[in-house]
Structures are given as structure tokens and as C-alpha cells.
């Protein structure tokens, strides 16, 4: 048992981000209800981050917050806020403003560095992989942070696979697969039998009825092409 009453540790969680592109609360509420109806098991009462970077018109934050919350979604933070007035309103509402990381800025050319001595040892880069060798049953959620996830058995309906990297399923895939959970748009999903309830890469998702019929139940590879999900045969 620890001698300290609390312990702070870094961790990562998979959250959906709601990008607002309209300042009208009723429009937002209806659009969210329509999305939730498409994937209730995935989105109902889900914790979400609200991104406001797409809002140009004056915003009544209290009404917008009520519109999002009225759908059952639980706002855990706000991102993309650069307007000082809106920041004050959000802070008064008791919601945290989240940083999305530093933007890359142009840098002047670095000074020429001295030539390093010859390498005497070859360093091989190793990517971690989480391996699951047993069936993943309904209600189970498996997360592979900062690595790929490989499942060598079946994944039942109602089960959820999440990975920051790629997902490989060498069995019947009936549940939900979310690759690139931390935003890696190069992540992919590989299935030998694709019958998933939901597939997602870096937040771009399909429900089962969006999977092209010619790939349903077949060996398939999913990836992002031109910012949209696409599927290819897995040979």
C-alpha cells in the first residue's frame, strides 16, 4: 500500500472531438442527435472534447454548451479557442481549455554541425506491439497506447479495440476497431473477416452499413486516402 494519499501519473484516453462549424445552438443540437442515432453504442453519453476553432460568428457559449449537453454528451474540455472573450465565457462555465500542442514554426537554417565520428554500432528501431491471443468478448475494451494492436482470435459484437497505431485482427471482426486513436492518420486496420460494427481511423469512421458490400465478411485493409476512409482487398 502506498504511503502517499494520491499519486499523479500521465495517461492517455480516447475521446471523440466535436468540431463546431455553426454558432446556432438548435442546428448543433439536431446535428449531434442525428450523429448519436447513427452509433448510439459508441456515442451515447460519451465524454467529448468540443473544438471551437471553426466558429467565426459571435458565440453565445452558454446556449451552445446547453445544446451539446442536452444530447447526453459530456463535455470534458474545449480546444481550438483563440478568442479572448470566448475563453472567459468558457472558463466561467468551469470547463478546461485544452492545448492541442505547439504549432510548427519556421526556423532559420541551423549552423553547420561538426561531423560526427563514425558509428560503430547499428541501432535498430523497434515498434512495440500489444498481442491478444484470446477471443475479445462483448463489453470488453482493449487499448494499445503508443503501439499497434494484434488480435489472433475473434472479436465479438459489443467489444472494442483501440490503438494509437495499427490494428490487425486475424479472426472474425464483429466489434468496433479504432486505429490511430491519438490522431495518427497513417494508421490502418487489417481484418481477415470484416464484419465490424464500427471502424475508425484518427476519428474518421464508418458504421457497418457504410462498409461496401463487396468487402463485408472478406479480408480487407482500411486506411485514409485524401482524408477519407477507404477499403482495399487484403491479399
From Swiss-Prot:
Gene Ontology biological-process entries: cell morphogenesis; division septum assembly; regulation of cell division; regulation of cell septum assembly
Keyword set, alphabetical order: Cell cycle, Cell division, Septation
Residue numbers spanned by region Disordered: 98-125
Keyword Transferase attached: no
UniProt cross-references to Pfam families, sorted A to Z: MinC_C, MinC_N
Family, similarity comment: Belongs to the MinC family.
Quaternary structure annotation from Swiss-Prot or TrEMBL: Interacts with MinD and FtsZ.
Protein name per Swiss-Prot or TrEMBL: Probable septum site-determining protein MinC
Taxonomic source organism: Enterobacter sp. (strain 638)
Amino acid at each position: 500500500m502506498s504511503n502517499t494519499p494520491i499519486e499523479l501519473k500521465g495517461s492517455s484516453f480516447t475521446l471523440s472531438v466535436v468540431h463546431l462549424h455553426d454558432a446556432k445552438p438548435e442546428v448543433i443540437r439536431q446535428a449531434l442527435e442525428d450523429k448519436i442515432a447513427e452509433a448510439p453504442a459508441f456515442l451515447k453519453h460519451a465524454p467529448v472534447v468540443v473544438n471551437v476553432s471553426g466558429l467565426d460568428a459571435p458565440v453565445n457559449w452558454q446556449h451552445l454548451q446547453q445544446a451539446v449537453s442536452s444530447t447526453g454528451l459530456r463535455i470534458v474540455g474545449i480546444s481550438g479557442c483563440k478568442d479572448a472573450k470566448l475563453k472567459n465565457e468558457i472558463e466561467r462555465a468551469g470547463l478546461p481549455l485544452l492545448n492541442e500542442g505547439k504549432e510548427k514554426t519556421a526556423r532559420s537554417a541551423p549552423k553547420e554541425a561538426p561531423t560526427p565520428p563514425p558509428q560503430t554500432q547499428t541501432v535498430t528501431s523497434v515498434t512495440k506491439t500489444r498481442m491478444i491471443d484470446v477471443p475479445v468478448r462483448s463489453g470488453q475494451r482493449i487499448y494499445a497506447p503508443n503501439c499497434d494492436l494484434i488480435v489472433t482470435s475473434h472479436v465479438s459484437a459489443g467489444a472494442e479495440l483501440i490503438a494509437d497505431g495499427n490494428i490487425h485482427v486475424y479472426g472474425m471482426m464483429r466489434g468496433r476497431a479504432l486505429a490511430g486513436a491519438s490522431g495518427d492518420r497513417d494508421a490502418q486496420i487489417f481484418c481477415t473477416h470484416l464484419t465490424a460494427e464500427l471502424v475508425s481511423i484518427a476519428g474518421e469512421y464508418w458504421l457497418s452499413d457504410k462498409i461496401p458490400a463487396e468487402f463485408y465478411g472478406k479480408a480487407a485493409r482500411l486506411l485514409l486516402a485524401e482524408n477519407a476512409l477507404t477499403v482495399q482487398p487484403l491479399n
